[in-house]
Amino acid sequence: RLHNGIGKYVRIDGDNYVEVSQSLRQLISRLRLYNDDLENRIAIPELALASLDNEFDDAFASSNGDLLAIRDRITKSQIAEFVIPSTLNGELKNYQIDGYKWMMRTLSWSGGVCLADDMGLGKTIQTIAVMLQKRDDGPILVVAPTSVVLNWQSELVRFAPSLNTKILNQCAHKTKMIDEISFGDVLVASYGMMLTQIANLEKKEWGIIVLDEAHAIKNYNTKAFK
């Protein structure tokens, strides 16, 4: 009922009313911004939890364990120091360092990231820095338009020679390559190749999946999106 209206008094049944405190009304107003239009309840996406500040600590304290765990990861990520990997063969500009730290911070609490800098500002090297830092999380999959697959290979060789880069499009034994890929490996594939090998790719537990020109999957009716 609070979902539908948050006046000072809310009728719970018949002639019985309960007074809603100002702090609770403020909380509900904030939460309704993230509402998924579910009947009689408010849904909060994980990514929205980062914007709920300390004034709502009491609400988190009485919530379920999953919500508390997510909030704890977010809190820790805000104070964590994310250093540039020493294995990165290149120098990041200040704004690229900010982008790298933002990606690491968001990934540390299981959020996904969308890096939308203008062309030429170094999205690739920022992403490669993240790959180097997260290499111990598992093999890495990069999906890109066919026209830039080889560019990814050259950039990885240039900036991250310690990573083992493999091009799925060039391999004659694709199933074997996917099966054998492991920690420290980066598999680069075109969107078309991803679709033909999706059954094999889905079997693998990837540490990171990078989608270059991710607008390629914006249409939810396409096979690439699914």
Feature-to-residue mapping (PLM):
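Charged, low-complexity intrinsically disordered regions
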Residues: 1-73
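ASCE P-loop NTPase motor core, strongest for the SF2 helicase catalytic module
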Residues: 60-226
